[in-house]
Amino acid sequence: MSIHPAVGFARVGNSRDAFYFGPDVVGQLPRGPFKDAKGAMAKQAARFRIYGYDAQGRVLGEVTSAEASIEWRVDVANTKAAWYSIDEAFDIPDSPSVPLRNADVVDRSSLVVHATPRRLRGGGAGPLPLDGGDFAGRAVTLGEVLTDERGRLVVMPGSGEAYSVPGADPLGGFADNDGWTDNTCDGPIRATVRIGGRTLEAEPAWVVCASPNYAPGIPAGLVTLHDSVESALFEAGRMPVGATDFTRDVWPIFERITDLQWVNAGYLDSHGFGSLQDWTQQRWRERLADATTVNEPFRSMVADGFRDPAFTEVQPTLEPQMYGDAVTMPPNLVEPRQWLALTPLQYRHLKAWARGDFTDRRRPVVTRLSDVPLDEQPATLDKASMNACLGGAFHPGVEFPWIARVDWLWTSDLRLRLGSTSPDAGNWGPELTSATALSRRGPLSKLGPGGVTQWMGVPWHADSASCRVGYQKALSLVLPGFWPARIPNHVLSEADYRIVVDTDRTLAERRRAFRTRREWERFIAQPTRPPTLALMVREWFKQGVVRDRPGPTDGRFPSRMKVESDAGYDVEPPTEYGAWMWVPQLPMFPFVVANSNDNSLRSVDRRGRQVPLGLSAALGRPEGITRDGSGNLYVCCLDANIVARVTPTGVVSTFAQGLENPVSITIDGEGNLYVANYTTAGWIAKITPSGDASTLVAPSAGLVQPIGLVMSPDGALLVSNAGPGTVARVDPVSGAVLDPAWIAGLDGPRGMVFDASFHLYLGVRWTNTVNRYDVDGNALPITFTGTALGEPFGVAVDASDRIYVSNSARNVVNRIVVSGDSGVVSDFATGLPNPGGIVFNG
């Protein structure tokens, strides 16, 4: 006797009545409902069955309450708050040690929510609540259990709430927030079967109650949980793998990539409908399946576009364009695991396919379990359950953590090994090391209730609402992504979908609507992380779900479309705060500094070494400088009264003219440039990506000698004014001066920059200082030691939040290493001829 699926997944929801089941066969889409009539989120229930086997392991059939007496036992817990912090997966190189969550709480058991174990017998039993647990004295229910009329077990998950202790800090971290927990959970499922005068103990299963699936219309992510577990067993020599079959082993990779077009705008561009690599087009399907020698160069070219899971080199431009286990924000070009790769087994099949070493046995698509041959039904249930969950990146993950790749944690038939009947309250010392975590005598050997979800973010809302944080202005506002197949990035809205399917509208209008993708988080997204997370806790169930919908019948668009549906908001937000605001422009070396005395642009590497850029034409006193996502530099030429564009190859052209002492320039997320014109009646020009210039802030608006510009995290344009010694806030759309003296009392303010913590650093000329402020313009204390600054002008920040300041009086760029409220200043690049603006150009 065995319980199937071996690992079943439920997903939290706050509806009292609405629920649906996950897939029973691979690729099956849940039917919903995904919201109830009041807008609450439906629960995904996990259903477990028992199958009987003969002595040779052959499947005899499903065992139900009609022919047997079945007693189910369910034991689940949530131990997140008692566990350790989440940094990186412990099974990758150089994973750091992590401290306990809530380390100051002595009674660790008070942080464990352990529901009273439940037993059910027969068909139609229950429901019984999974209650009896509490968090710091507050009762927490983890769901309920019941059986259907045939005696199958149904696990209903919790309500999806987050819980905090009095006085807990607001949510701020994506994975670790002391004083908080949620009501996700996991634990073993066991069953005793009495049949034909015999009493048999079924092979146990595991239930995981996870966060919602916000994209039930997407059947699978590129790397599934089943892929990761199967690959781990294969690499350990515990699972034989046969010859590569295109339809079974290779085609899903391309199908899944194409499906991401509905949840990520970058994949719409690269692999979506109408793109050059829409693999689901029949012509591509046939060519991909072509095993002939003539087609080998094509197959090899496609396969070479995928990242090698050996991770021997950094390959940021390859597929998949998703972040990996070791990602940092901003990502660097040192650690290969900053990006996700296929599993080693997937990659093995891909390489075999590229060589032509594959078959293609196409089988009929099965959509119901009853159509699956009996002997394949148990394994089908197991695979379908795990295939609908993500197998990476484990940072920490959506439904399941990195422990999926620990082969000895699994039986050969994909069951988790139960090691303890008690939850683990983090009794492995004040810090958990990689060696302990991976030890066969470590916590994984004691896997018990709560032992899976404890490795996940707490509460789940924080991680789910942080999945856009990596978008970078300097690279792409849409790629890489984290887990779009379950937590969308960009969606086709209901309103745009209605335009697309309306055949009475013009084709141009419909195409424009089809290409429009809205930020999925737009209803809760704020300029900074904490208020976004707070809104997610309150309104997580209002977020739309991406459902499968019929396309128009005229053949000009996909026949099936995946559409954001049931969003619980009456109107669209007035502003969509781009996720790039959470992390400034990707600051990779080298940086480029403009030098006005010799009209040069000099590239400075991470060691401070300088190389003049080769330019096709001279610049007329370069001052301010910025960069677009394609690597073009835009330079304010003070004497020539123009903005020059410098391509990555050094070709210089006039991008905008008719300016008046242009001295500073910045760029927004849409590629618009803003230029400060340094005059007594100062004004700001706005230049579109196509080069159309207009006056954003007129000379009559009251700006006096504007000299520095930066985009604020809340979307405002900040302008430093040398005349009155102020920083003004400006609406970058209307040009209205929102606050002429947002910061005042400065003696020669100049360049500005925000770091990754949203601290504003402002160079002040005549006091030879760099001031620091919070996002509201409040001064923050900071003191400097080391080399003195000399009339600071340009200010930039690198990936480690080190500040770089050009000093026009000393002809150097200084580096400031900030720690807390102090910074150490040193000369970084010397001998520069009157350095001005700085921009990172890596």
Give the role of each language-model region.
Residues 617-630, 658-670, 678-681, 700-715, ...:
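Beta-rich, blade/repeat-based domains predominating
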Residues 596, 638, 678-679, 722-723, ...:
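Short loop/turn segments immediately following the C-termini of beta-strands
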Residues 604-609, 646-651, 687-692, 731-735, ...:
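Short loop/turn segments that connect beta-strands within beta-propeller blades
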Residues 609-616, 651-657, 692-699, 736-744, ...:
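A short beta-strand motif characteristic of beta-propeller blades
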Residues 600-602, 641-645, 682-686, 725-729, ...:
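A short loop-to-beta-strand structural motif that recurs across blades of beta-propeller domains
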Residues 1-588:
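Aromatic- and Gly/Pro-enriched helix-to-coil junctions and flexible linker segments
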Residues 590-593, 632-635, 672-675, 716-719, ...:
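Conserved beta-propeller blade signature
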Residues 588-625, 633-635, 840-842:
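An edge-strand/N-cap motif at the start of beta-rich repeat modules
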